[in-house]
Amino acid sequence: MTLMISTSVLDAENASRRDALTRDYESLGDRLARRGIDIDAVKAKVAAYGVAVPSWGVGTGGTRFARFPGPGEPRNIFDKLEDCAVIQQLTRATPAVSLHIPWDKVSDLGALKEKGSALGLSFDAMNSNTFSDAPGQAHSYKFGSLSHTDSATRRQAIEHNLECVEIGKALGSKALTVWVGDGSNFPGQSNFTRAFERYLDSMKAVYAALPDDWRIFTEHKMFEPAFYSTVVQDWGTNYLIAQELGPKAFCLVDLGHHAPNVNIEMIVARLIQFKKLGGFHFNDSKYGDDDLDTGSIDPYRLFLVFNELVDAETRAANGFDPAHMLDQSHNVTDPIESLMTSAMEVGRAYAQALIVDRKALAGYQEENDALMASETLKTAFRTDVEPILATARLENDGAIAPVAAYRASGYRARVAAERPAVAGGGGGIV
Amino acid sequence: MTLMISTSVLDAENASRRDALTRDYESLGDRLARRGIDIDAVKAKVAAYGVAVPSWGVGTGGTRFARFPGPGEPRNIFDKLEDCAVIQQLTRATPAVSLHIPWDKVSDLGALKEKGSALGLSFDAMNSNTFSDAPGQAHSYKFGSLSHTDSATRRQAIEHNLECVEIGKALGSKALTVWVGDGSNFPGQSNFTRAFERYLDSMKAVYAALPDDWRIFTEHKMFEPAFYSTVVQDWGTNYLIAQELGPKAFCLVDLGHHAPNVNIEMIVARLIQFKKLGGFHFNDSKYGDDDLDTGSIDPYRLFLVFNELVDAETRAANGFDPAHMLDQSHNVTDPIESLMTSAMEVGRAYAQALIVDRKALAGYQEENDALMASETLKTAFRTDVEPILATARLENDGAIAPVAAYRASGYRARVAAERPAVAGGGGGIV
Amino acid sequence: MTLMISTSVLDAENASRRDALTRDYESLGDRLARRGIDIDAVKAKVAAYGVAVPSWGVGTGGTRFARFPGPGEPRNIFDKLEDCAVIQQLTRATPAVSLHIPWDKVSDLGALKEKGSALGLSFDAMNSNTFSDAPGQAHSYKFGSLSHTDSATRRQAIEHNLECVEIGKALGSKALTVWVGDGSNFPGQSNFTRAFERYLDSMKAVYAALPDDWRIFTEHKMFEPAFYSTVVQDWGTNYLIAQELGPKAFCLVDLGHHAPNVNIEMIVARLIQFKKLGGFHFNDSKYGDDDLDTGSIDPYRLFLVFNELVDAETRAANGFDPAHMLDQSHNVTDPIESLMTSAMEVGRAYAQALIVDRKALAGYQEENDALMASETLKTAFRTDVEPILATARLENDGAIAPVAAYRASGYRARVAAERPAVAGGGGGIV
Amino acid sequence: MTLMISTSVLDAENASRRDALTRDYESLGDRLARRGIDIDAVKAKVAAYGVAVPSWGVGTGGTRFARFPGPGEPRNIFDKLEDCAVIQQLTRATPAVSLHIPWDKVSDLGALKEKGSALGLSFDAMNSNTFSDAPGQAHSYKFGSLSHTDSATRRQAIEHNLECVEIGKALGSKALTVWVGDGSNFPGQSNFTRAFERYLDSMKAVYAALPDDWRIFTEHKMFEPAFYSTVVQDWGTNYLIAQELGPKAFCLVDLGHHAPNVNIEMIVARLIQFKKLGGFHFNDSKYGDDDLDTGSIDPYRLFLVFNELVDAETRAANGFDPAHMLDQSHNVTDPIESLMTSAMEVGRAYAQALIVDRKALAGYQEENDALMASETLKTAFRTDVEPILATARLENDGAIAPVAAYRASGYRARVAAERPAVAGGGGGIV
């Protein structure tokens, strides 16, 4: 297997931190044992956990106002896979990559699959794109795609999704994620009902072509790029879609796609209860679909989402098998650093949720002891589980401190020298 | 039939406005005719339209900080019915009253029904109350009602709903509206899934006892009185309830119960499309469940909701038969004046939606002519339909200018003399 | 003066609508007279009113996901001025254009000024751009501009603003509008206090170079492009800036730059009261800085803003002289049509505010007659003032129905033939 | 000094936890030492820190829908002081109580002061109440108080504030907190400018009577009890007030009084920078002014607020001396437990902010290393500082685990037996 970061750098980095980590792990183990928790069992679960990385995440993102690229931007999916391999090597938490078509389209799928294998990466859910026009495309998506009033445009969008499935089959993917920007900017522009009927008809055509062992994930979003109405605007509509399509259809929850103040963990619980939670696009946000680094704004909210997931896992909820993926826009950081940190944040929330005293919690809930129920969650959240995460990484040949190891490796400077600088772009779209 | 306002006052008031109204109606008819619209047909529809008044709406509302009562507060449901009769006499748009149990509980239901008949009022949906404790109640709803962890408390809440149905049957009502405040104030306080399972079980027990010709309306609300999670928090959960319960179960939409920025008219469209729109609690809001007078904050939003309703009515959407009710808190106005004005605002939105050029709109939607689609709605909304509403009222023996007629009648001073002043209350709940 | 639309087309269009307009104007005059309002006086004020058009508004806008250009996109500021001239010719409500530097930078300012004169357009406030990197720029604005931690970058941003002033002086502009995207995406990324100190220092350098008869407008915005904190995030900070800078500094209010639910008309009132209202960027929004067409989402809110403006105008508030400009992103419409319609919407809100019965309103406010105060505003808002606007346009040689006249003229097809199609862009910025 | 909880109970509770605490404190000290932090120095600061408790907080709160009292509700301010003394005895973090007039009005101020002394409690800021009508009050606050259109009503509100100052002087308080509910429920109901002028005039009269060594805190709030506009709606208006009044006037920040998504820590920074931060009402919220327990919903936000406070403290910001108070509504918990837990949460955020590596942070900020700046804060936040807080309590004769000690003491059952049960109330205010 090709390793992007030299093991000598990594070993030296780990060596400098190993003793302190051992002490911290022991001390934490002692404290957890007092609470009846076996630290090694938690570590084993954390070590087995992974979150997929989006191929587009390793490039610098931007806004409609501007994009400010960083050095060494990946030029194509092969470069992107190498960056993803760095993330996986150091964190040991991101074994799969999620592709975006047509951005990651290649002529030789076999070469792509081989590259992934060589880097130890598999291919997660495929993502279609009918929210922008590819060069030379016959019909524009300016006024919609799967819900467009014109049947030829809808057909084109359906075909594109089918092509994504075909590519995914070649790469070993088992799921298709469909997010559309379809909607309207003016009251009256679109007939809500007819648009949704058209969307459902199109999705049924896609669904019909889905292999038996695949799942299809639909993703809701409140607004942007449409600013008055969006066809798949919330989890209610998303649930209706999954219900209309059938047993292979599930709802994808992106943490930044909801109205202000919405209780997202409750939506997660409802979708689990009705067997339609497909998975997540993890990120964080303060205002809208900010696509900030996971856990950087409201880490307790992330924990509360994982509290629902571990609750479902613990009681072996029927049909519970969500896919986990990061989906962020890295506008001001090195994308590799952001994705490593975010993957660790997801793992941290998982670890914290694992050490919730669920028996005590259930008792407090039954007795309506609101304060102690809250404290039970807070106690788990307050626990600094970093020694667990770091030990899991170390034992899996990753880094105790991935960002430090990455910086020590000089990887960014190396690829900056190899990959030519790209223009900024975005500045004329206001 | 007993008339609360003397016809001589009403006639005098109308006489002073009749000529101007005739001219305005003619001039508007001329303008509408140019757009291919028959003003008399619109007037006929408006004249036939009614919205129910909530019995509690004729008392002065308040907040957790204070309640500032006005003069002549109704002392009981009989007083309330008289106030409601004033509203109906002058607006001719509020033929039914919606009761709230136990607030409107009486020992003699026959007398109550008779009083309604004498005043020309029928009884709309019954409203149960399991969000506050009635004196002497065996089990408290402090920690929930239909979803409470304790089965005896749930049973009590179920029985209360069944009692509401019994009362409603005696009065000629055909629907039960269920809104619960159940939820939690702390993460962890409640297990979302188990609480919803308990809620559904309780509601199934209520549903099972529903007469064949009744409907049951469940009402979602984002927050308040619970401030972290609410069991029936949004239309997605509300839809699941209606689906789980069966064909007599429908979703009620209160305009003030959504997250900030949410597109409510789209939710209305979805519920119509999936045959689960039960009806409305009309009001307006700027921040939360402000319960302000309908149309006082965002009249265009109200129009857009009615645009969906008329769209469904026009295409005779399957299963479309929503109930219309006002639900407001009148903290700084004479409740009778607010309810009259709000009933007229609802009628206004309906009239404006009726004169939308739907054929042109459909064409613009098909061609993605967003600007002209928007202008088609705006043109209807901009039309001052007051002459239509006023003429419909006049021809139905109501008032051209209900507030002016009401003030001229001296009704408030009269009841202030008859009904003793009540204390303010509310001041200690912070 | 060069006319972009042939007068024969315009005359024919107007001829077909003139009789109906005359009747409608008379009928409206009759109704207004009954309320003690002289329709001709209102018309005169409306006719004298103008709103500036942003040069960038005549191009198609987009989002970070995609931009879908329309036919005949303007290639440069000369093309843009021609499009602006169409808007002014037909609406007679947009006599000035606001430029954006460097987007509208030219080598020959004299030619630009002459072109404006020939088209009957003057130059409104200059807009600087330090939120994106121009090709070849020495220092990047990736991490801020006027508040950047690096003094050379701040100096560059200051110089750019000074250059904008110089260009504006040559063109007859009298104001500089400064909006920066400076902020942060992570808690901790920026020290709020130091960043604001640096911003103020930079702005003081710009202010020092401002000609005596110029004003400087600073614009606040809650978020985007920065997603955790923004240096000039709200009107409170904006007020502090204007206060720190001095008497030529004022606050600019963009209707889409506030937190959800915020009462914008109240902010307008506060800024007027404290003599710091500089002007407006008009648009509409439902979720964030959606930059939708003015009045398309919440026309009553627009009216309430104008209600404050007319209130201040009526009482001749000290220091009250706001600048009016549209600032919208036209993603799915012909930008010329959107700007014409929006200019008319602004005029409509002004006309509606002019016919508010201010004496009655003051009385109701004094007596706390909330309902009648509200009805006083609603009565004005409900009045269809289109005949006033259309007559004002007609008498100023504009179009009774600008969009219809524009479509009849074939202008878009003509420029589409002359101006080569442009690429979409935007698709890689997610 | 009177101790409400017997020392034998407390000692037994502490004894059972002391060994584990010693180990945890040592282990944490070891980890902090590695980061260059002296745990004892942090502990000393935490031990010296206190937050005031609101007298009304020890009673059960409610909503406009209902209030569900708990057992042993305090009957008067003497009972309330005893409950507050429990909180202080166990947490050693709440040495002062903030009174609310007229709720806490007594005939014998000397007795009240003595009772406080006996319990080891001092008196923090006085709170006036002009948002509800006291029995027998001459003028109603239904339509406002300090901003009312009627001068006699304003005068009454001024006098009430002056009385609060007089009471406070007798008790040793040094500050007056003014929060008014003044505002409007309808567009047009209130003239924003005139209402604010009247408010300022009234406040100037209050300010004029303020003793030299007192401060006056004004508190802004977006909405509730007024639902369209609020006179002191945000920090911008609050700043204007403090500026207009003079050097003894400061702004109070309640964490739940802002628009959705607003960056509160930034407002705190601005007020510090402009020397007008008066202090805090701590609580937490998810939707509006939910008045939930501090740190229960978004603990990271609380930490970010304290990060600003410690930043200001570290650089000895000019004029920086904020008052700290809890302000919560305990609807579903034992108020004593909630207040103890919340006081500890405030201390926790303070301790976490104290261990931020500020030198490293400043370096990352200077270099725009957004990721490491964020990680620097997250590292401090992730540290479980409970051993520091618990040791500080223990060394101050408080409880290692205050809630457990309180439950063991049987205090609630004791007062429930002494204090008669109270009615629920609130149920009629909808």
From Swiss-Prot, chains A, B, C, D:
Example GO molecular function: metal ion binding
Protein name: Probable sugar isomerase R00627
Essential cofactor(s): Mn(2+)
EC number per UniProt: 5.3.1.-
Binding site for Mn(2+): 257, 289, 291
Keyword Isomerase: yes
Mitochondrion keyword on record: no
Pfam families per UniProt: AP_endonuc_2 (PF01261)
Enzyme class: isomerase
Swiss-Prot/TrEMBL keywords: Isomerase, Manganese, Metal-binding
Family: Belongs to the rhamnose isomerase family.
